[in-house]
Amino acid sequence: DSVVTVGSGAFVFSTVRRVTVGNNVVLIDMYAFQGCDKLRYVNIPDSVKRISYYAFYGCTSLKSLYLGKGVETISDYAFYQCSQLNYINLPKSLKTIGDFAFKDCYKLLYVYYEGSEADYEALGITGTNHVISDAKKFYNYNYEG
C-alpha cells in the first residue's frame, strides 16, 4: 500500500485482464496500461485524483470502468481506442475531462454521473468527447465500487 503512482508505461502491453488499483494511489501516469488488449475491467479507487494522458490507450477489450469518487481529472486521450467500453461512471468530484479522452469509444452507451444534471453540464464536455455526449445519462447516481 506504499505505492502512490502507477508509473508511466508500468503495464504497457501486459496481458492483465482485471485491474484493481491500490487504495493509496493518487496518479495513474501516462501510458500506464497502454495496449493491454486483454484488460476487461478496471476499478479505480477514491484515492486517485488524476488519470493521465493515454493511460489506458488501446485497451480494446475494456468493457466497464469504475472511477472512484476522488477522480478530478481525466486527461487528453486517457481512454483512447477503448473500443469495447460500454459504460462508465463519473464522480461528482470530476473537474476536467480532457480533449479526446474517450476517442473511438464507439460502444459507450451509458454514463452514470454522481451529481445533478446541472453539475454535469458545468463540466463543459466538448465535441471532442461526443461519445459521452451521445450516451444515455443517469444523474444523481450513487454507486459503490
Label each residue range with its predicted role.
Residues 103, 124-128:
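A structural signal for leucine-rich repeat
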Residues 1-5, 14-27, 37-50, 60-73, ...:
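Structural signature of tandem-repeat unit edges
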